[in-house]
Amino acid sequence: MTRRFFLVLLCIIAAGAQASAQAKTTVVILVRHAEKAAAPAADPPLTEAGVARARALATALADANVRAVITTELIRTRETARPLADALGLPLETVHTGTGGVHARAVADAVRAHAGQTVLVVGHSNTIPLIIAALSGPKFGDICDTQYSNLFVLIVRPGDKKTGLVVSSYGAPSPDAATTCPGSMK
């Protein structure tokens, strides 16, 4: 799995360099927030495992040429993104949660405001698939509630009707979705 991760990271870096060469090609990296505490239920912070995953994300993307970081207003997305944003000296751009499709389109608009750059989006298990679809990526099933290690990479080119998607992982492995959430994305 480590080898696969580094191959994907190499692709991200290469795509970032390509994005610089092609003025409007945008690399979008999407992750679900890291592991969250059980309370408070409405807006929990990260657990110790989540804090470790947020640091792993910062390490994994340190050389990926990220130029913008988009989160929701919820603590768990902001805490997941903050180590990378702080390391790169980038502000966290907030897109408020709301109805799924409306939120996904708002995130897609925020990404498009950074055309030609590499953008990190930290979302939720129920918003990441919608955001990918809003950016013309392929549709897929829900992300299992126990899955935190997925890393999705989209290469968005102006005029393309469909956007390619690479799925990888980072940090500690999540439990096997086949046993914890049958029928969801693995």
Model region roles, listed by residue range:
Residues 1-4:
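Positively charged n-region of N-terminal signal peptides that target proteins for export
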